[in-house]
Amino acid sequence: PIAGSMVLAAILLKLGGYGIIRMMQVLPTTKTEMFLPFLVLALWGAILANLTCLQQTDLKSLIAYSSISHMGLVVAAIIIQTPWGLSGAMALMVAHGFTSSSLFCLANTTYERTHTRILILTRGFHNILPMATTWWLLANLLNIATPPSMNFTGELLIMSALFNWCPTTIILLGLSMLITASYSLHMFLSTQMGPTALSNQTAPMHSREHLLITLHLIPLMLISMKPELVI
């Protein structure tokens, strides 16, 4: 069910990140070197989740693995226990909560019309539902973390904190962000561009669907203008 996916991606997954932040306050801040294996594991996990996204044919699975890869960055930022790392983790959790939930919502609008989640069978929607294509483009740009979005602020803070702590992490971070951009563009092009595979008539997007996406993206854009509300 779509509601379950949206709540899981937007709230429950981020509650895990919040739990890690609370737990880290109990542990010593002076010996962050002991957390190095966990940090490498978190970043490597993010890269593996991104690579899994690239080979997905199921739209919903792709978005779910995308959430996991972003949480890998969040965990890595929390582990080093610096103010910038924690601020970046909070910013990315809030921003990606809105983004992944809106992507799940868009995936459901596509599924309701095509009755399939296979990427190659949902193509050609830019001719049929141009407004939905606009929403897909905005959501994917936010997923890539294009400036001046909150996603970009969060990832920039995380990158700065990790690079300051250990310059070698920039290789893993850079690779992760490159693959994120690749699968996001792949998802957009696969679902929206090319000739349509549909033979029957497609129902237009309902006002409630437009409202649902708007209520995800507008608050995120407003928070992006005033990030001190979160970080």
From Swiss-Prot:
> Keywords, A to Z?
Electron transport, Membrane, Mitochondrion, NAD, Respiratory chain, Translocase, Transmembrane, Transmembrane helix, Transport, Ubiquinone
Principal subcellular localisation of the protein:
mitochondrion
Q: This protein's superkingdom? A: Eukaryota
Quote the catalytic activity from the record: a ubiquinone + NADH + 5 H(+)(in) = a ubiquinol + NAD(+) + 4 H(+)(out)
According to its UniProt record, the EC number is 7.1.1.2
Quote the subcellular location field of this record.
Answer: Mitochondrion membrane
Functional description taken from the UniProt entry: Core subunit of the mitochondrial membrane respiratory chain NADH dehydrogenase (Complex I) that is believed to belong to the minimal assembly required for catalysis. Complex I functions in the transfer of electrons from NADH to the respiratory chain. The immediate electron acceptor for the enzyme is believed to be ubiquinone.
One of its GO biological process terms is: electron transport coupled proton transport
- GO MF, any single term: ubiquinone binding
Query: According to the UniProt entry, where is the signal peptide?
Result: none
Q: Which family does it belong to?
A: Belongs to the complex I subunit 4 family.
Q: Which residues cross the membrane?
A: 1-21, 34-54, 63-85, 89-111, 128-148, 156-176
Its membrane topology = Multi-pass membrane protein
A single Gene Ontology CC term: mitochondrial membrane
Gene symbol?
MT-ND4
In Swiss-Prot or TrEMBL terms, this protein is called: NADH-ubiquinone oxidoreductase chain 4
